[in-house]
Amino acid sequence: MSVYLDHAATTPLRECALEAWTRAQRDLAATPGNPAALHFGGRRARRMLDDAREQVACALGADIHEVIFTSGATESDALGVMAAARGMRGRDGARDLIVVSGLEHDAVSHQREVASREGFDWEVLPVDAGGVSVLPGVSGDDAPGSWDGRLALGSMTLVSSEIGTIQPVANFAALVHASGGLVHSDAAQAIPTLDVSFLELGLDLMSVGGHKVGAPAGTGVLVARRGIPMTTDRPGGGHERSIRSGTPDVAGACALAAALTEVVSERAAF
């Protein structure tokens, strides 16, 4: 019998997620409907999606209106970093700087190429010998003057996907906000083991991937604070606050909600 230990890469599908997905698919097969439609089937699908959104918000310490369903953490990272940076520069043309940690997942670090093409500067924070990001300023208490008036967005992973070190995200968020920027964090690796609260971390955006918590691959969430400027490069039908257009995967959202709810309940036993 084999024993699976590579949970940092992906996790087995939880039974609760499989049951939620199957139940939702059967309901949708019996009463088809696009959540954006006004007929009975559409309204029912919308209720299913909203119920899933509420469960996810509760699990992540967020407001229901802040939850945007995506295809996974990679898409959430791309949207969270670039859509917010574009939005900030659109509001204030001088904000052309993006600052990230040196431990970001490729989904964030590879946005550098996109950012460069669009005229953004990209700064990477150093990492100490213990695998923890080094914050700028005197003992990490002060944001550098070079950030003032220029910083559009800062991104720092909550837990490194490579070495598992916990990063000083809350302190980083305070520095970024002091410079007038927005803060994003990829929390995909942290959700199974840490108490993660979007509100308490002081974030503006947070990415979560379904397959890291026992939900199906191809499911994910971007938590985005209401009122922040975001300019997506993927216009469409206006779904998910017009940030992530496309007919939502209702069954996938239900499965993700079930998995996250179970993960949170299990953390209390650690």
State where each predicted segment sits.
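Pyridoxal 5′-phosphate
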Residues: 1-270
